């Protein structure tokens, strides 16, 4: 295995979930599991382990995206920068043309700094007049 620390972390998540009955995101949101109903069923136990690991990883991602949405809303003018859609870890905003040069660096700074992790968060930004015409934004 090229990533022994990741394997250890995943095993830790599985063991903690078996002990506590829940998986917890880095921001404290919990997903509960009914351990009694699956005890002794290897298939269901393995399924619960996969669900617990996914809940922590994907749930933490969702928590961070929500924090970013709140931070962007608080800092930027909602009349000129409107959230349109969230898809997994992507956010789609409608930004007034005269605000793009000001808004993009601020949005990037907000999103990359909204939650500190051991690894830096990286944000890719695309702009366009329609979803199908989006091009990577180079500031």
Walk through the language-model features, giving the residues of each.
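Conserved catalytic core of nucleotide polymerization and phosphodiester-bond processing enzymes
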Residues: 1-139
């Amino acid at each position: 295995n090229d990533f022994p620390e990741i394997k250890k972390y995943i095993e830790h998540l599985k063991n903690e979930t078996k002990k506590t009955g829940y998986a917890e995101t880095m921001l404290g949101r919990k997903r509960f599991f009914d351990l009694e109903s699956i005890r002794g069923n290897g298939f269901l136990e393995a399924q619960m382990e996969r669900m617990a690991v996914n809940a922590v990883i994907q749930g933490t991602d969702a928590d961070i995206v929500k924090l970013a949405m709140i931070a962007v809303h608080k800092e930027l003018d909602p009349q000129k920068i409107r959230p349109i859609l969230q898809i997994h870890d992507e956010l789609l905003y409608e930004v007034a043309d005269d605000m793009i040069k000001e808004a993009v660096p601020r949005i990037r700074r907000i999103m990359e700094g909204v939650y500190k992790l051991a690894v830096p968060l990286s944000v890719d930004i695309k702009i366009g007049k329609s979803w199908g015409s989006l091009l990577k934004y180079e500031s």
